[in-house]
A protein has these predicted regions:
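Short coil/turn segments at helix-helix junctions and helix-capping linkers
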Residues: 16, 34-44, 60-61, 75-85, ...
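Positions within ordered alpha-helical repeat solenoids
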Residues: 34, 38, 54-58, 75, ...
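Eukaryotic scaffolding regions of large macromolecular assemblies
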Residues: 160-343
Length: 343
């Protein structure tokens, strides 16, 4: 049996018998697409997608069929069925890794847009699916970083434009376009992309100051770390309020993870200290029977919840935790830099 990479690298057009089997292959793919359009059972659809993934090398000569397969598979990926979503991303990744450049761009765009569409709401039921789709986006952006850079740059610029409008217009709609789950989830997704594919854990300095991979190639996505960091810093300043403590804590985590993985400084301390100094946290706590909100599933808390001792404890503990991690990294980075410079 051939390995997965051997299946991807296989070029059926180079076979002497290709002209004879080409109509059969084209008919097979077309009929499979028709079957996918008629199926309603998730298990059967998943099986068909898996068989298509095993035959993905035969899509290379047929650009129009590849577009149709990608479109249909993206619809399956966007569905709420977890098993179907797994089979769909396996096929999409195979298409992106096997077929010519335009196929990769379509697949990466489609997966990211499906994620962004599903990331609008966050609750206990959707959190796991959103996390899985985020991991899929990270995987897709790492297939070809040269092509992924342009797409990532465009999507990050969209986030920056929304932030700029919120800071300039100061309207309710502009504000809501930033302080919402879709915006925060997309920003967090790009932080994960950079951590996975441009981290200093994956790159080593060659003495010229340029970050290079183990095989000598230059990191392509790494320059995007700075705009992502600036967006996170700007988003935290849109509406400085203790009611949005869960959102700010989430942004602090993004900044700390990005700072640690890129080995760059981010001014986390002022944001954390400002959070600790909000006057609402110094008001006398009020006992309440209502359960404390889960900060991983909330972007803001109500005025009543903010007076709850449990909520105040979580805010203070989380702020100190992120502040401690920030200072620990700063001390480690200074020590490491001095040690490295004396070698």
């Amino acid at each position: 049996a051939k390995s997965t990479q051997e299946q991807y690298d296989y070029e059926p057009m180079k076979s002497n018998r290709w002209k004879k089997v080409e109509p059969v292959v084209k008919s097979y793919i077309g009929n499979t697409l028709h079957l996918l359009g008629q199926l309603t059972d998730a298990s059967m659809t998943s099986l068909v997608l898996r068989r298509l993934a095993a035959s993905v090398a035969f899509l290379k000569p047929f650009e129009r069929l590849t577009k149709r397969v990608t479109r249909t598979t993206l619809m399956c990926f966007s569905s709420g069925e977890p098993r179907l979503r797994v089979s769909a991303i396996v096929l999409l990744r195979a298409i992106a890794a096997t077929c010519p450049g335009p196929a990769l761009e379509r697949a990466v765009k489609g997966v990211y847009r499906a994620y962004a569409s599903n990331a609008k709401f966050m609750n206990a039921n959707s959190a796991e699916n959103i996390a899985f789709m985020s991991a899929c986006v990270v995987e897709m952006f790492g297939i070809d970083q040269n092509q992924s850079y342009g797409l990532a740059f465009a999507y990050i610029r969209q986030l920056a434009t929304l932030l700029r409008n919120a800071l300039a217009q100061k309207t309710k709609d502009a504000f809501k376009s930033v302080y919402c789950w879709q915006y925060i989830n997309c920003l967090e997704c790009f932080e994960r992309i950079l951590t996975a594919h441009a981290s200093n854990r994956e790159y080593s300095s060659k003495g010229s100051g340029e970050q290079t991979t183990k095989d000598g190639s230059t990191s392509v996505l790494r320059p995007l770390a700075y705009p992502v960091q600036q967006i996170a810093l700007g988003a935290a300043r849109v509406l400085p309020s203790a009611r949005y403590a869960p959102l700010r804590i989430r942004l602090l985590k993004i900044l700390n993870r990005l700072s640690r993985s890129m080995e760059t400084f981010a001014p986390v301390a002022p944001l954390a200290l400002e959070l600790l100094n909000f006057s609402e946290l110094y008001k006398a706590p009020m006992s309440t029977k209502a359960p404390s909100p889960d900060f991983t599933l909330a972007l803001r808390v109500s005025k009543t919840e903010l007076r709850s001792p449990a909520v105040q404890d979580v805010v203070v503990e989380s702020a100190f935790e992120e502040l401690g991690e920030h200072y620990f990294f700063c001390c480690f980075f200074v020590f490491y830099s001095k040690t490295y410079s004396h070698r």
